[in-house]
């Protein structure tokens, strides 16, 4: 919204700053961060008062988690609130990719909110049925995939970009939209599975979003794409503002989610963050790079898939418990140790993913 202040500029005054995506990204970061600090504690107090016993704890989960009983959930409301407010304030409203990513974020947040509400109100860990969540998630992803494809240049529609190879695209034809749907749905659920320890999901999500934001800015500029030999997607640069806001919102939330957590993000936050990452990857045509920068989420999801399939086939388990962060808990690792080491892994993967822009 503040972009329209450029209409007051004569080209050499302070209003001209609002033309620059990087300036507005900085503003979005600070706005979301301040939002988190201002409204975090009041929101936690409201959630604690409304929820009473807080998020239900699984009976078959790690023993150390029983001490977390009574901690309120739905803290994702703080993330989403800061993210939406900041993005709407600093991003251009005429950019279709910004609206697409915002739509996915809010829609998945609503699914997560319904799930969290069902869990808290019934005081069990079931929530909304898995089939219903999946169906709603697919519908959202279909809309987002078609939305992005419609706004991509004709030469990029239905194309899958290969990292490392110079401006190499594979035409998936009619398979592209189903592929994009899988990226968004898979990303949302992978982040959701990762959110099992205090601070575990939020930092890797922030790191992945920041990396994708840099990529979005790069592929949205002709000069950068010519230098890097990557495809040009006009309009994606504005997504940097969204990712900067996400980083600020994430820091604001982490202030209260750091061990021992005063609030959990719940499915409200994890589904929203995962959906946003998938939507950004689809918008920028960097779906495969998401698998690298979000590699931690991929591993967490794969650990569950492997565990379930292997157990059905043999009656035995590969991991002591899935997702894999619970496996390390069962092995005796302290929760902060797991969280910090997974953060480090996420940072390394993000650097590798970012390097794919240059390594051609």
From Swiss-Prot:
Sorted UniProt keywords: Cell cycle, Cell division, Cell inner membrane, Cell membrane, Cell shape, Cell wall biogenesis/degradation, Magnesium, Membrane, Metal-binding, Peptidoglycan synthesis, Transferase, Transmembrane, Transmembrane helix
Compartments (UniProt record): Cell inner membrane
Molecular function as annotated in GO: metal ion binding; phospho-N-acetylmuramoyl-pentapeptide-transferase activity; UDP-N-acetylmuramoyl-L-alanyl-D-glutamyl-meso-2,6-diaminopimelyl-D-alanyl-D-alanine:undecaprenyl-phosphate transferase activity
EC number: 2.7.8.13
Gene Ontology terms: biological process: cell division; cell wall organization; peptidoglycan biosynthetic process; regulation of cell shape
Primary site of residence: membrane
Catalytic activity: UDP-N-acetyl-alpha-D-muramoyl-L-alanyl-gamma-D-glutamyl-meso-2,6-diaminopimeloyl-D-alanyl-D-alanine + di-trans,octa-cis-undecaprenyl phosphate = di-trans,octa-cis-undecaprenyl diphospho-N-acetyl-alpha-D-muramoyl-L-alanyl-D-glutamyl-meso-2,6-diaminopimeloyl-D-alanyl-D-alanine + UMP
Pathway membership, UniProt: Cell wall biogenesis; peptidoglycan biosynthesis
Keyword Lipid biosynthesis in annotation: no
Gene Ontology CC: plasma membrane
InterPro entries the UniProt entry points to: Glycosyl_transferase_4 (IPR000715), PNAcMuramoyl-5peptid_Trfase (IPR003524), PNAcMuramoyl-5peptid_Trfase_CS (IPR018480)
Cofactor: Mg(2+)
Protein family membership: Belongs to the glycosyltransferase 4 family. MraY subfamily.
Annotated function: Catalyzes the initial step of the lipid cycle reactions in the biosynthesis of the cell wall peptidoglycan: transfers peptidoglycan precursor phospho-MurNAc-pentapeptide from UDP-MurNAc-pentapeptide onto the lipid carrier undecaprenyl phosphate, yielding undecaprenyl-pyrophosphoryl-MurNAc-pentapeptide, known as lipid I.
Name listed for the protein in its UniProt record: Phospho-N-acetylmuramoyl-pentapeptide-transferase
Source organism (scientific name): Ruegeria pomeroyi (strain ATCC 700808 / DSM 15171 / DSS-3)
Upper taxonomic lineage: Bacteria, Pseudomonadati, Pseudomonadota, Alphaproteobacteria, Rhodobacterales
């Amino acid at each position: 919204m503040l972009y329209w202040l450029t209409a007051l500029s004569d080209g050499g005054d302070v209003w001209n700053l609002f033309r620059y995506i990087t300036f507005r990204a900085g503003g979005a970061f600070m706005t979301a961060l301040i939002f988190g600090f201002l409204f975090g504690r009041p929101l936690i107090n409201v959630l604690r008062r409304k929820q009473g016993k807080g998020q239900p704890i699984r009976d078959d989960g790690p023993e150390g988690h029983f001490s977390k009983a009574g901690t309120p959930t739905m803290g994702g409301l703080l993330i989403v609130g800061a993210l939406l407010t900041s993005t709407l304030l600093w991003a251009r409203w005429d950019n279709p990719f910004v609206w697409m990513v915002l739509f996915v974020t809010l829609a998945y947040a609503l699914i997560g909110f319904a799930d969290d509400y069902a869990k808290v109100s019934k005081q069990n860990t079931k929530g909304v049925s898995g089939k219903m969540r999946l169906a709603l998630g697919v519908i959202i992803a279909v809309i987002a995939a078609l939305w992005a494809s419609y706004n991509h240049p004709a030469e990029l529609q239905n194309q899958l970009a290969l990292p490392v190879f110079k401006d190499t695209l594979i035409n998936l034809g009619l398979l592209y939209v189903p592929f994009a749907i899988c990226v968004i749905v898979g990303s949302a659920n992978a982040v959701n599975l990762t959110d099992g320890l205090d601070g575990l999901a939020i930092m890797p999500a922030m790191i992945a979003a920041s990396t994708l934001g840099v990529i979005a800015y790069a592929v949205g500029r002709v000069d950068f794409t010519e230098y890097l030999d990557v495809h040009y997607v006009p309009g994606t640069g504005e997504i940097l503002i969204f990712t900067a806001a996400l980083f600020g919102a994430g820091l604001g939330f982490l202030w209260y989610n750091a061990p021992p957590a005063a609030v959990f993000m719940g499915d409200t936050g994890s589904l929203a963050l995962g959906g946003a990452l998938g939507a950004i990857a689809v918008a920028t045509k960097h779906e495969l790079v998401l698998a690298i920068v979000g590699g931690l989420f991929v591993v967490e999801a794969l650990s569950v898939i492997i565990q379930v399939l292997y157990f059905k086939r043999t009656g035995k388990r590969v991991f002591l418990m899935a997702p894999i962060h619970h496996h390390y808990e069962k092995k005796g690792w302290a929760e902060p140790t797991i969280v910090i080491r997974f953060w480090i892994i996420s940072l390394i993967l993000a650097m590798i993913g970012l390097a794919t822009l240059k390594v051609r």
